[in-house]
Design a protein with these regions (language model features):
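Surface-exposed, interaction-prone regions used to assemble/regulate multi-protein complexes
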Residues: 1-134
Length: 134
């Protein structure tokens, strides 16, 4: 499954070196109008090449052998090739090698904790949805 939010502004919100987790977050549309919070969380991050801010975001698992080979050569990756995820935005391309990323969308206060901060956090917000990028 592909994750695509081309009309949102995403930022690298947090990276934990000790837990090797990456959190991307969007609170606004590209127009800077407020919208529901969207978060993408990836664990077991081995490699990341990405911009700190992304104008629109599509994430998909790299699946074709030719594309895996081309990206592995381009970024100098030799391990965990089955866990490459391509990040595409209007201002460039990025790549992570990680566990399967998850996403969540919820209407919540801007100062609320991450939707991935603890089990059941997303359930606090009516209408919230979650998924995985496989």
């Amino acid at each position: 499954m592909e994750f695509s939010q081309p009309d949102r502004l995403f930022s690298v919100w947090e990276y934990s070196v000790t837990h090797r987790t990456l959190l991307l977050r969007s609170d606004t549309y590209l127009s800077l109008e407020a919208g529901p919070r969207i978060e993408v969380s990836a664990g077991h991050v081995e490699i990341m090449f990405l911009r700190s801010t992304m104008r629109g975001l599509t994430i998909r698992k790299v699946s074709s052998a030719d594309e895996v080979e081309a990206l592995a050569e381009r970024y100098g990756i030799t391990e965990h090739l089955d866990f490459m995820f391509l990040l595409e935005s209007a201002n460039g391309q990025g790549l992570i090698v990680s566990g399967i990323p998850s996403w969540a969308v919820a209407d919540c206060p801007v100062d609320a904790p991450s939707l991935f901060s603890r089990v059941g956090e997303v359930d606090r917000y009516p209408g919230a949805v979650m998924g995985r990028i496989e």
